Amino acid sequence: MQRQRDYTMNITDILTIIENGENSLIVHIDDRPVQNAGIESLDLEKVKSFFLKVYDIDLKEVNQTEKDRILINSCILIPVNSDLFLTMAGILFFGEKKEVLYSSLEQYFPHAGIQFVVYANEDLEPIFDRYECFEPYPEAIDSIVHKIHLNWKTPSKIKGMKREEVSFPEKLFRELVVNAVTHRDYSIHSKIQIRMFSGRIEIITPGWLVNSVTIEKMKAGISIPRNPLIIKYMQNFRYSDQLGRGIPMILRKVREMPGYEIEFKEDEDRFLAILHLPQKKRDLF
């Protein structure tokens, strides 16, 4: 039996609704500060590269006051009292990736990581492969898709006198992972889980569908963004088009893959995308 949704709001959420009206019942938190993640947790080189490439702004040529103003207006940083902290979106995209010890994301926002596991069977044991990803976006998406590819057994088909391998559906998995990281509920303290079995691959995203959105509406391209700032940065990095076409694109790609099926469902406080694999793919596992 499914649990009832928890609509508990804090005082900030209530004040937002009073100020902005009923549309604010969708409470966005991706512009809020991450506790203890100060400006020293920022990957300044990535920030500079981003602004130069996307906005043609050279941060090397502006003073510190102007630089802070730009980062605050971009919702990468947020002032709290007399200090600057990374926002949730700021640490997700521009958190420092350290060579040793923890990355900024793992240190200050660990439940935003992505867990990838390959299981031998339905008993969840033994585990063939396991990977915890705490890279910033969008690099984390590339790393997870790469791990799926490494564990992907490629079937082949005979065409004429030649054996041709069926290519790995990289764009499909990229779209599935992008959909998960942009629409998950970051207030829930659990990671996105990607579980690989012989007959299916599950992408488990923390959080209910937003408000009146249903699975059928999603299939029709109707969506309400839970994390508009994250979606905006995904768009800037060319990983999303912000047009609500993610699920329709996924459905179209799956229809182009004979023997594959995709299933979407809500399970308690999680959203699941389950890619069912054809028998010839299962036999290779």
Where are these regions (language model features)?
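Conserved N-terminal catalytic/coupling substructures associated with nucleotide/phosphate chemistry
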Residues: 1-284
